[in-house]
Amino acid sequence: MAKEHSFDLVSEVNLQEVDNAINLAMKEITNRYDFKGSKSSIERTGDEQVTLISDDEYKLESVIDILKSKFIKRGLSQKTMDFGKIERAAGGTVRQVVTLLSGIEGERAKKLTKLIRDSKLKVKAQIQNDQIRVTGKNIDDLQQVIQLVKEQDLDFPVQFVNMR
């Protein structure tokens, strides 16, 4: 049985869960006493961006904490959030744009493939656009690669899909 087995390493964000987390965070902001009369809001401004608006930097930090807690509750990784600079907005408010990271970029992909190749397992790792395809003849080797990647402290979330 010389069949090749494979799986893909991807870094994706479930946008439906992001929307759910934002809605839960907005519900908490509207109900919290310390945000009464505040202009605080969270909204998704495109596929890969979330805009946070608040009265001042202190309240913006509270909004960020609320959003992070809702991400955790919805099973989303905080590593997907890349926080931009805090900037002044209209009406005396402050704004911060959060970029949602998805896909494994070139440098990160090279780092992961090198890690897999250095493990001396009988598998091949190939970079395909923004994902990595790992192939091997033995399923046990692929499972060892999955375990190896899970043990690494990466600065981006990784999911394992298309196990064949």
Swiss-Prot record:
Cellular component GO terms held in the UniProt record: cytosol
Highest taxon of the lineage: Bacteria
Keyword field: Nucleotide-binding
Gene Ontology molecular function: nucleotide binding
The protein's role, per its UniProt record: Nucleotide-binding protein.
Similarity field: Belongs to the YajQ family.
NCBIfam families: PRK05412.1
Protein name: Nucleotide-binding protein BH2387
Organism: Halalkalibacterium halodurans (strain ATCC BAA-125 / DSM 18197 / FERM 7344 / JCM 9153 / C-125) (Bacillus halodurans)
